[in-house]
Amino acid sequence: MTYLFLICAILAEVVATSLLKSTQGFTRLWPTVICLLGYAVSFALLAVSISRGMQTDVAYALWSAIGTALIVLIAVLFLGSPISVTKVVGVGLIIAGVVTLNLTGAH
């Protein structure tokens, strides 16, 4: 169940981050409200995941790594961000780091 809360936290964070550009510097009301609510929900669900037994280091590593990878994917596919070798290698290294953290008994 802790992983379900974590997945929902990641998705809320990804939605909020994806909306940042549409807030136009937090000058547009509804995109700003939805963005800030997304971040609040994300942190609350991350906290629930940790309070229900997931190790803090594992939860945060997964939350940040998967969120980062998804944001890069969304930026490339939908927001016009160019793909580059640097981005691919960077996301690969992030994923490798999270896998390494989990394999070394951090949980």
Swiss-Prot record:
GO terms for biological process: response to antibiotic. Pfam families: Multi_Drug_Res (PF00893). The chain crosses the membrane at residues 2-19, 29-51, 58-80, 84-106. It is found in: Cell membrane. GO terms for molecular function: transmembrane transporter activity. The keyword Membrane applies. Disulfide bonds: none annotated. InterPro entries: Small_drug/metabolite_transptr, Small_multidrug_res. Keywords: Antibiotic resistance, Cell membrane, Membrane, Transmembrane, Transmembrane helix, Transport. Gene3D superfamilies: 1.10.3730.20. GO terms for cellular component: plasma membrane. Its main location: membrane. It is a multi-pass membrane protein. PANTHER family: MULTIDRUG TRANSPORTER EMRE, SMR FAMILY PROTON-DEPENDENT DRUG EFFLUX TRANSPORTER SUGE. Multidrug efflux pump. Confers resistance to tetraphenylphosphonium (TPP), erythromycin, ethidium bromide, acriflavine, safranin O and pyronin Y. Belongs to the drug/metabolite transporter (DMT) superfamily. Small multidrug resistance (SMR) (TC 2.A.7.1) family. Mmr subfamily. This is Multidrug resistance protein mmr. It comes from Mycolicibacterium paratuberculosis (strain ATCC BAA-968 / K-10) (Mycobacterium paratuberculosis).
